[in-house]
């Protein structure tokens, strides 16, 4: 088709945008959905969830390998063959063995495993679901997780941008637990390494105690 004929035919993508803008009554952003809406904020929050979760997975593998005493040169070779569930089970089993006489450390590591699993569940629900648009509000208030080999029916969860931000913050708290547990272990091994000699492992373990975050709310089928 010649350039002149293309010009006469117009740009199909622009025609489509014009159609939907006239139908909906507000402008369409072709990349992020609805202009000037909370939907953009949802996408930003999802990006934060992904970035923080990537860090959590790295911390989990590093922490578990170090705690289990896997030599540093071969630790990456071992850990890359384990999925998140296997790594969590390995850390829990090592804790049961190593902390046989240290109930406080065993409790803290078990909490870490539970927190990691809860954040993993919420993150997986988010990233494997689709945002459901609330057109009048120009936002999203639900997500739908499609059917899969493990679930015959799609599942709908209540989920606003605040829920996504909360999950991102939960993952950030998880990453803080990794750091505080590492400090507690180092303090137990050599208290002189810290600038404040009065610090004890219990001071760091105390920072690892809080309520598990909630799961996303599953809505009843309509």
Q: Where do the model's predicted regions map?
A:
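Acidic, Ser/Thr/Gly/Pro-rich intrinsically disordered interaction regions
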Residues: 2-51, 58-222
């Amino acid at each position: 088709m010649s350039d002149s004929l293309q010009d006469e035919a117009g740009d199909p993508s622009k025609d489509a945008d014009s159609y939907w803008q006239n139908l909906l009554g507000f402008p369409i952003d072709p990349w992020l959905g609805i202009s000037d809406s909370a939907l953009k904020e949802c996408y930003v929050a999802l990006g934060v969830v992904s970035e923080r979760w990537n860090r959590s997975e790295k911390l989990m593998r590093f922490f578990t390998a170090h705690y289990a005493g896997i030599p540093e040169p071969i630790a990456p070779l071992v850990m890359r063959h384990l999925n998140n569930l296997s790594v969590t089970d390995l850390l829990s089993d090592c804790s049961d063995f190593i902390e046989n006489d240290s109930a406080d450390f065993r409790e803290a590591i078990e909490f870490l495993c539970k927190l990691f699993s809860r954040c993993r569940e919420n993150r997986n629900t988010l990233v494997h679901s689709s945002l459901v648009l609330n057109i009048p509000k120009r936002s999203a208030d639900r997500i739908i997780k499609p059917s899969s080999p493990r679930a015959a029916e799609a599942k709908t969860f209540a989920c606003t941008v605040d829920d996504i931000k909360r999950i991102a913050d939960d993952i950030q708290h998880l990453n803080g637990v990794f750091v505080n547990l590492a400090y507690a272990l180092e303090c137990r091994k050599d208290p002189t390494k810290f600038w404040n000699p009065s610090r004890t492992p219990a001071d760091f373990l105390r920072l690892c105690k809080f309520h598990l975050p909630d799961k996303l709310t599953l809505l009843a089928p309509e």
